[in-house]
Amino acid sequence: MAQTELNVSQREGLGKGTARSLRREGLIPAVMYGKGVENCSLVVEPKQLAAIIGSEAGLNSLITLKGEGAFDGKVVILKDMQVDPIRQTPLHVDFQAIDLNAKTHVLVPLVVVGKSEGEKQGGNLQIIRHEVELVCLPANIPANIEVDVTALNIGDALHVQDVQLPEGVEIPQDVNFTVVTVTGRTAEVEEEGAEVVEEGEEAAEAGE
């Protein structure tokens, strides 16, 4: 995965008051931490961050921080981001410094591709999980993992251990949750339920 640069600056002052002041100025408070590195309080420019999030790698981009401070040149990933529930804009960002030669755990989006045989027969595809935890070197972090559902019939389920992964990418061995399932014909079930209700109403009327 290609790396991208992000210009940041050292944040002067801590606490909620400082963070609120930065947001009023249109900036995003952030922090960088990681094994063997000095924790740094930072300030991020929203447009630069938005460009990274909107890239192909998205939230799993490898980012090289640039600026004057101990953080300069550190390679990080976006570990956490607090978002305004109404405006959907970032309120605070956590960057985790990583070692490019050590495997890391990341959450990657799952993308369903294809139309299942069960859907063609009138079934309903239910997506149970939208992301998966992966273990890999930072350079091998994928933007997403595709889940091919074309072979699934009604009653079938696909588990995370069944998902095809890129080379150099692993799923923790103790994890095997259900990703998608194909259930029966919901339309028929609803129709049958309506018929039962109608029959019950007719029986009630006959008994009056």
From Swiss-Prot:
Transmembrane segments: none annotated. InterPro entries: Rbsml_bL25/Gln-tRNA_synth_N, Ribosomal_bL25/Gln-tRNA_synth, Ribosomal_bL25_b-dom, Ribosomal_bL25_C, Ribosomal_bL25_long, Ribosomal_L25_dom, Ribosomal_uL5_bac-type. It holds the Pfam family Ribosomal_L25p. It comes from the Bacteria. GO terms for cellular component: cytosolic large ribosomal subunit. Keywords: Ribonucleoprotein, Ribosomal protein, RNA-binding, rRNA-binding. This is one of the proteins that binds to the 5S RNA in the ribosome where it forms part of the central protuberance. This is Large ribosomal subunit protein bL25. It comes from Syntrophotalea carbinolica (strain DSM 2380 / NBRC 103641 / GraBd1). The gene is rplY.
